[in-house]
Amino acid sequence: MNRRGKIKYVLRAKVKTRHLKPSYTLKKRGFRRHKKTFGESRMKSVLIAKSIRKNLKYLRKYAKISKNSKSETAAWICDNFYTAEQSGKSAAEFFKRKFRLSDEIFDICKIEIQEQQNDREQDIEKLLIKGLCSKSEWFDCQSLTALPAVLTALAIDLCKEGAQKNDPSKAAKGIELLARLRSVDFETIISRFSASEKIFSADPSGDYLKMTAETRAYYRRVCADRAAKRGIREEQFAKTILEKAKNETDPRKRHIGYHLIERSEQKRRLYTLGWVFVAARAGLPFVISSVIGILTGLWWIGWFIYIPIHELLRPFCEHFFARLSHPFFMPKIELYGHIPKAEQTLVAVPCLLPSPSGAKKLCEHMEELFSANQNGHIGFCILADLKEAAGEKMPDDDARIKALKREVKKLGEKHGGRFFLIIRKRVLLKTQNAYAGWERKRGAVTELIRFIKTGRSQFIELLGDRKFLRECKNLLVLDSDTRLSFCAAADLVSAAAHPLNKPVVCKEKKIVTAGYGIIAPIVSTESAAACKNLFTRIMCGRGGINAYNSPCANAYQDMFAVTVFSGKGLINIDAFYECLNSSLPIERILSHDILEGSYLRCGLCTDVELLDGCPSSMAGFNSRQNRWIRGDFQNLLWLLPFITVGGEREKNNIFFLNKIFLSDNITRALNPFTCLATIILSAFVPLPYMYFALGILGVASKELFEFLKAILTGSFSSLSQKYHCRVLTKTSYLILKSFFGITTLVTSAAVSVSGAVS
């Protein structure tokens, strides 16, 4: 019998863990071995991270070998290993940041572990507060933030010691401690003993104490990091920030966050990194396509292969620069899910007036929105347009209007008048030679905001409390198939209410120069929409909302603190009226969302997520793509230094970055056509296989890159599912989507050309 078989035999028969190879432990080779550098002076955090990973590796091996054992220790470890692994990985990730931990914090955590071993019923929070009080009155933010991670590391070490010695009591104490740590309010402890918390509480604007706990923690972390880079004490740096804020007269600059976040070296570094990212994305494909053209003697072929190379390199560039930056954090004011009077909000759903049978379904959707977001000063409005017709009035208009009014009145009576109905009249659209709502969705939002600001309107129906509408400060615009998650509206408003996010409008240029006129959420595909048929499963993947919302990566938002507006988000009514009331030409814009984001400055709130529908057929998908591409080519006028509005030539004041957003859309729109052209050209030029592969990879590069990343990060287990589910696994979805994109390349190219020339 070999050694491995002997280990398995001994563990299963007698569960004697001494036969396992001893691993790196906090006591033997971690904390105790490095006592001089950690216990007395300080120990590098990377050593703690290493010890956690070693202990988890040991526990994983123990759980695998002893899964059939009847020992009590094995039962504790095997049943709770995934809990320990999850907590341990989070702690190890925390300690990857290179900082030094104070002696006092580690001593307090050791005492805490000893007390818990003696009496498991003792309150962890009270013991920590008692220990902190006995050591010092104030602590630096880094040490306090490390409390849960250090306790987790020690608890995992206790579990591993129990496994090594076959001691069920130690294993049980370690597992129970990990479970109890999740219920400890560390934020309260950190706030109580943090030196920077006490100083920032004197914020001249008074906004610091109104912020969410996550935002205050972010401020403290930034303060600690900036102080460490300067080589000064955290308390000293916090006082410097406070003094700068006190010396300001501008309300925005009197908030400590302006000097801490807006004027930080980190923000300037990310801004510079962003322009390197933009230059790399545009320059690398140009260099590569030029070199290929020169080496092959076909200088003209660079025009065809530039875009395929651009799209091929896109995921690599985005991934590389995302690793150099960090997810953007959107600061928020604490609203506790209740929208205050000062931030009164209207949820507006622009749509076409439904048939009498569809009116009930639309109102049911509005009631769903209300059910998840009803706390505070918030209203819900159906902003309906009559369908396009040959005349100003049609015979079935009255029946449709009466049916929808009846359903909205029922909702108002049921929920206390929180629902509104606005119907616009038809006007002649000269460019289309038909009658419809003025400027369609853009016109509907613009006319609603004009009514809120002036009280004047040309609506044929306005059902609801006009006074409430006139007092609204924010407008949350959604589509008729968009679903709000619980308290999503309040979360967006809490971001908009923060002083750093309030829009600053340049009255001369009619553009937002700081803050945000639009706060946009993450938009995901609804699970039900993603599971309709094979087409939606291929195009949308799993769909659904992420149950563990956290800030996620978005290249432009992370580096430039601004993103592209996609049509769904919270609009500041005053900023919109001041910037876009009459700044855009009439009947010349189809894709207005990206332009609205360019004028109003759109910020992405990455921890708020909405659910949206998707086309259920190839025809519907191509129709939408054609419409978007047409709009993108119409927006090419905004790449010029001047635009024509109302017959007058005006200076184009949108930022250069927004022009990059516009050109980026054009590049994506032309990609199918250029990839198809490259594949066709491969039959007539030297090195045909290279050009053929380039055309194929240009279409499927994003999906293939994500597939490789999923395999490398999630191993081959990502190819299977651990439960029954109608949607595809991530890897299956990526493979099928790349294959689908290649097989439908001709159709996609035709849609691209049609949208460009129409």
Regions from the PLM with identified roles:
Residues 22-23, 30, 536-555, 620-645, ...:
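Catalytic core of nucleotide-sugar-dependent glycosyltransferases
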Residues 24, 34-61, 79-89, 137-165:
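Helix-rich C-terminal or lid/interface subdomains of diverse kinases
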Residues 40-83, 87-89, 93-94, 216-226, ...:
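Low-complexity, highly charged intrinsically disordered N-terminal segments
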Residues 72-119, 474-476, 482-487:
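Active-site acidic catalytic loop and adjacent metal/ATP-binding pocket
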Residues 104-137, 153-162:
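Active-site activation/catalytic loop segments of kinase-like enzymes and analogous catalytic loops
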Residues 140-144, 266-286, 348-358, 647-674, ...:
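Loop-to-transmembrane boundary segments
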Residues 159, 164-275, 328-655, 659:
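Internal catalytic domains of large membrane-associated glycosyltransferases
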Residues 287-323, 667-758:
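Membrane-embedded multi-pass helical conduit in multi-pass membrane proteins
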